C-alpha cells in the first residue's frame, strides 16, 4: 500500500507508552504515530505500528475508526496465546481481517521471521528490531519520513497511567501496568538513536508538563529546536 499522498517533509509525532506520554491533538501541521495501545492518546492516528498481534483487540471500535494505517510484521508476535513466537496460521492477514476498512494495512518483516523459520515474503521490508517503537522509526524511515518528535519515550522505563503491556512470555494473556524489564528501555533508546543517526534523520524527544496536551502551539515551540551532531535533541517544557 503506497503512502505517496503523504508529505514526507512533515514531522511525525510518535506517542510511546512511557510516563511522559501526552494526548496529541489533530492538526494539518504534523502526522501522528502510535504503538501498541497509544492510539488511545491520539485524536486521530495516521500510523499505528505493532509487533505483537495481541494489541489489535485492545482498541475500541470508535478508536479504530480514527486510525488511517497499520504497519505490522507479516508474522506478528504474541498471537498464539502461549508465548511471543509467530505462528504460520496467524499471519497479518488472519489477525487484521476484523479491522474496519478505513485502516490501510502495511506488512513488513522482522528478525523473528527467519529465526523461527516462517515462510516470509522476502519482497517485504525487513527490519532487525527490539521494540515496536524501533519498528515504527524504521518503517517510517523506509517510507520516506525523516523528522520525528516523540512523547512518552522514557529511557528509564515506566508506563503512563493510561497504558499497559501484555508480556510476550505470557502469550499476551496478562495485562500489566508496571514494566518488568526497565533496563531494556535504555538499550531500546540507544538503538533508536542509532537508527536516526544512520539515516541522517532528526528526532526530538519532548517532555511536556503533566496535565498538558500536544497541539499545534506546542509543536511550534519544539520543531525548530537545535539538534546535536547525531540529529537528536531533548526538550523539556
Predicted feature descriptions by range:
Residues 1-237:
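Metal-ion/cofactor- or nucleotide/acyl-coenzyme-handling active-site neighborhoods
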Amino acid at each position: 500500500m503506497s503512502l505517496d499522498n503523504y508529505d514526507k517533509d512533515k514531522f511525525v509525532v510518535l506517542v510511546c507508552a512511557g510516563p511522559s506520554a501526552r494526548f496529541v491533538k489533530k492538526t494539518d501541521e504534523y502526522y501522528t504515530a502510535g504503538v501498541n495501545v497509544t492510539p488511545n492518546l491520539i485524536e486521530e492516528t495516521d500510523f499505528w505500528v505493532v509487533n505483537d498481534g495481541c494489541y489489535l483487540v485492545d482498541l475500541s471500535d470508535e478508536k479504530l475508526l480514527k486510525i488511517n494505517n497499520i504497519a505490522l510484521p507479516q508474522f506478528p508476535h504474541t498471537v498464539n496465546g502461549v508465548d511471543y513466537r509467530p505462528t504460520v496460521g496467524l499471519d497479518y492477514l488472519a489477525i487484521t481481517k476484523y479491522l474496519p476498512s478505513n485502516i490501510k494495512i502495511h506488512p513488513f518483516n522482522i528478525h523473528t521471521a527467519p529465526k523461527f523459520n516462517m515462510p516470509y515474503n522476502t519482497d517485504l521490508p525487513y527490519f532487525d528490531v527490539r521494540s515496536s517503537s524501533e519498528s515504527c522509526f524504521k518503517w517510517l524511515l523506509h517510507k520516506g519520513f525523516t523528522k520525528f518528535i516523540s512523547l512518552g519515550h522514557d529511557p528509564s522505563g515506566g508506563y503512563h497511567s493510561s497504558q499497559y503491556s501484555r508480556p510476550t512470555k505470557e502469550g499476551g494473556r496478562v495485562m500489566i501496568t508496571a514494566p518488568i524489564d526497565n533496563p531494556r528501555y535504555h538499550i531500546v533508546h540507544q538503538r533508536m538513536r542509532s537508527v536516526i543517526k544512520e539515516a541522517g534523520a532528526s528526532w526530538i524527544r519532548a517532555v511536556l508538563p503533566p496535565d498538558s496536551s500536544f497541539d499545534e502551539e506546542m509543536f511550534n515551540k519544539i520543531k525548530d529546536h537545535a539538534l546535536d551532531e547525531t540529529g537528536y535533541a531533548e526538550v523539556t517544557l
